[in-house]
Amino acid sequence: MLILEKTEKFMAIKLSDSKSFKLEPIRKNRWVFQFSAIPGNDNNQAEALAFVCKTCNAPEITFEGQTANRMNETFNYAGLPKWNDITCTFYDYIRNSSANSELSAGDILYNWSCMIYNPLTGQMGYKTQYATSATLAQLDPAGNVVRAWNMFGIFPTRVNYGNGLSATDSEICEIEATFKYDLAIKITDAKTATESA
């Protein structure tokens, strides 16, 4: 009978600062979040909404815990995966005209939400009508993609059309939106910056 012993061993630790001069950090302000298409809007609105996106979080995955008990011990296993929500804020500008090509972030997201639930008719939409895909791309100093997340089956679950309105505040209005999605796949671009280590 094979018996595996529980032992404690220290891993070798090596500290060196030689790489510090070559490493280029990924910056929090170099990113683009864009939908492939936005339901209820024309094709130009995906780029328009990406242009005014101010904040966004990256995908996060959590595994539900499952346990099995034997004798005096508990063993842990990974359960079902669960993806977090994506929360974004968008600058809200006054649209220049009534044309669809000049819609504000609030207009675009309202049109999208009406594909999920239309308050005029009371109808709900099919998922194939209101869900789309999106990409969150993080960039290097030269604008090359160094990391990207493709999210599938994404749609808004909450839209706040104006939080904190005040007669004494002249800051730009922002639209807050929360999105759910089915899954995300991380893509690393093959073309890295020439200065990368």
Feature map (PLM): residue ranges:
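Glycine-rich, low-complexity intrinsically disordered segments
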Residues: 2-197
